[in-house]
């Protein structure tokens, strides 16, 4: 049988050290509790440097095990650095590529500090930009992989190409990858310059694929379009031309709908903006040649039918933001898994209303936007920079049809 939380203590001197240190750990951004976090104590003596977490084991180790609380025991009197580590390799060494880290900003002095009242927040650092590689994944489509978050990533074709040669570059959602589609060309390879500010890489990508993929178009709505959403169709190849004369868009009474079609600059999608009505059915027919992709191939006939919900099918959350100190905050509405549904920024007392919500459970996340850049920023250990503070409103918001919830948020 497993002997849990077993301790075996011995001393190489005349007595056993008896000081303790306790506290708790949380995720800096997500609401879920953390488990099995390593807590590391480094003695601040003449041999200590800030790089210690990267290259040597700590002086003391403990773990939260199956909770978010930790406790060190049998500690020696002195000054320490306290670090929390979500240690992917269980080697007690900080690897920024795989590990989350948290640190207590002040020196721990024992026996004065025995209980850390503020929670340690662990975060994943933003890695420095490094270009990885480029390769062809299908004829006419290349991918460029990189590490980190580039601030000004550009791709330039260096090979000699015809005047009508086109490229379309789109980021891959959720990945450190750029997709590049190019016009068909009879070459064995293409040379590109990849630049991010003053970091420049030159690469050659071999072209070996023989068959172009035909254009496929997929409706994203799933048959029901939320009243505040845009109608999108995703495509496997990026679209370069929309012929509205090959599109028929009507609602239930077969009355033509005025709309604006556009090509997304962020994803391989085509969008349709129109005045939506509650509890209405729509038909959208895309006839051949309505959409033309970068390879000059077009769609087959697509018959799409979808509807909108009635006004009574939606709920609403109204938040009274009490912010007397005028602190810049981002108020986010999330689903039960912490994915952002909607957000508003505020640095004053105001009412924020999240309307037309699908009935289900939501959370309210408050980001203290200390640098006022409109987004959450993670921390950095070497810079001794903590992640921007995040709080979750304690109550889950259960939205019901045709109902408004009202809450007060005190900043």
Residue ranges and their predicted role:
Residues 1-411:
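N-terminal targeting or signal-anchor segments and their processing/structural boundaries
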